[in-house]
Curated annotation (Swiss-Prot):
GO molecular function: protein dimerization activity; RNA polymerase II cis-regulatory region sequence-specific DNA binding
Protein name, as recorded: Hairy and enhancer of split-related protein helt
UniProt keywords, alphabetically: DNA-binding, Nucleus, Repressor, Transcription, Transcription regulation
Compartments reported by the entry: Nucleus
Gene: helt
């Protein structure tokens, strides 16, 4: 129903009906007033027009800007997933934020290595499990490092605090009893040894960011407290290599050593 239908010409009426309707209209105008009568009629017309505009707006296609934003969001989401999936990109996460072009290049190199004739196929389940456990433990220790940094710098907890020791002991017990990688859990440092390795360093007000140490040793510096958490070198344990060393040597030879450098010149300033 639109405004034109409201003002449709009425059918012809008799003189008696016309007089009766005129009397009713007069009584309505006397009760509401002429201004209110006009406002009520126009308000009804206005509501009908707004309803038709809303229906037309719903039929309007999505703007080009919205489509472009959705497309960029999908691209960025997929690139983030690639950065967490490709081993070479995962190993370089600590050296700084990777550019989109770098992630795509590493993905192409990784796929070429997978499809190359030199790359071994049909690897043993135990070998794959060992490699996956390598990345699992490396990521777990990275999370523990960040948690210890948070507890000592933000929560102001002392290393001799009972709650602090219980948290680290709980995390260590979880990584040892992991059902998937439980057979490799013995390579993780003992909770007691881990607590003994926590020590204070001299305060350094100018350094307030994490610094990556050589493989097998993680440390960070803070403006308040600077505990150092040193894990046993991963390469010292049989079947448990560092993330870069754990990659298959055929993959390394195919891509090249420079692609795996964790201290690339592009990220030296970070």
């Amino acid at each position: 129903m639109n405004a034109r239908a409201l003002y449709k010409r009425p059918p012809p009426v008799s003189s008696s009906q016309s007089e009766a309707s005129g009397k009713r209209r007069t009584r309505t105008l006397d009760a509401l007033g002429f201004d209110n009568y006009i406002i009520c009629n126009y308000r009804l017309v206005f509501y009908e027009m707004m309803a038709s505009k809303m229906k037309d707006r719903k039929k309007t296609p999505v703007s080009h800007k919205v489509i472009e934003k959705r497309r960029r969001d999908r691209i960025n989401r997929c690139l983030n997933e690639l950065g967490k999936t490709v081993p070479m990109a995962l190993a370089k996460q600590n050296s700084g934020k990777l550019e989109k072009a770098e992630i795509l290049e590493m993905t192409v190199q990784y796929l070429r290595a997978l499809h190359s004739a030199d790359f071994p196929r049909g690897r043993e389940k135990g070998e794959l499990l060992t490699e996956f456990a390598n990345y699992f433990h490396y990521g777990y220790h990275e999370c523990m490092k960040n948690l210890v940094h948070y507890l000592t710098t933000v929560e102001r907890m002392e290393t001799k605090d009972t709650k602090y020791a219980r948290i680290l002991a709980f995390l260590q017990s979880k990584v040892v009893t992991e059902p998937v990688f439980g057979s490799l859990g013995t390579i993780s440092p003992d909770p007691t040894d881990l607590l003994c390795q926590l020590e204070y360093q001299s305060p350094s007000p100018t350094e307030s960011v994490f610094q990556q140490s050589p493989p097998g040793h993680f440390s960070w510096h803070s403006s308040t407290r600077s505990p150092t958490l040193a894990y046993p070198a991963m390469s010292q344990h049989s079947g448990y290599l560092s993330p870069v060393q754990g990659l298959d040597h055929h993959y390394m030879n195919f891509i090249g050593h420079n692609a795996f450098s964790l201290h690339n010149a592009q990220h030296a300033a970070l």
